């Protein structure tokens, strides 16, 4: 059971980080909406699908595998690194919902609307830098989360000599 939980947790973590990278690549390839609105809209729709169908579900399933592992393995109950992973996962979930998935979804909807209403083109691509920074920060937190699971630091304070 323990190996199955670890395997599931590892696979979903790989999927999550992979989807962050895919979204980053899409961001780097976005054309200016005023130059190629159809391409911009298509890419934004693809990004929305990646965020909704891969990024968020993989993170939620990874969280469930991690919680199940914490419940099933008594050694994880008091391990500071395990609690650190839980905290970083909650940060990743909130950051992914608020900083990645929601803005991508809004922009995809706006891009589709701009296809029929040309006046909306000027409202597109206003927050690209914020989305890119969200991807970078969430990617770094996810990397720290993986590092905690791999190296499992003890976080023990050094004993002070008795006087």
Identify the residue ranges that each predicted region occupies.
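Polytopic transmembrane helical bundles with strong interfacial aromatic enrichment
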Residues: 1-163
């Amino acid at each position: 059971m323990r190996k199955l939980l670890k395997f599931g947790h590892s696979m979903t973590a790989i999927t999550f980080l992979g989807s962050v990278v895919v979204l980053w690549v899409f961001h780097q390839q976005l054309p200016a909406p005023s130059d190629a609105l159809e391409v911009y809209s298509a890419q934004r729709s693809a990004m929305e699908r990646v965020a909704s169908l891969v990024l968020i579900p993989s993170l939620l399933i990874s969280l469930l595998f991690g919680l199940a592992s914490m419940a099933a393995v008594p050694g994880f109950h008091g391990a500071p690194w395990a609690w650190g992973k839980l905290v970083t996962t909650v940060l990743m979930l909130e950051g992914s919902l608020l900083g990645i998935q929601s803005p991508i979804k809004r922009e995809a909807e706006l891009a589709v609307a701009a296809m029929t209403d040309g006046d909306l083109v000027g409202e597109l691509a206003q927050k690209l830098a914020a989305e890119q920074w969200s991807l970078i920060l969430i990617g770094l937190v996810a990397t720290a989360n993986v590092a905690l699971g791999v190296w499992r630091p003890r976080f023990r304070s050094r004993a002070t000599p008795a006087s």
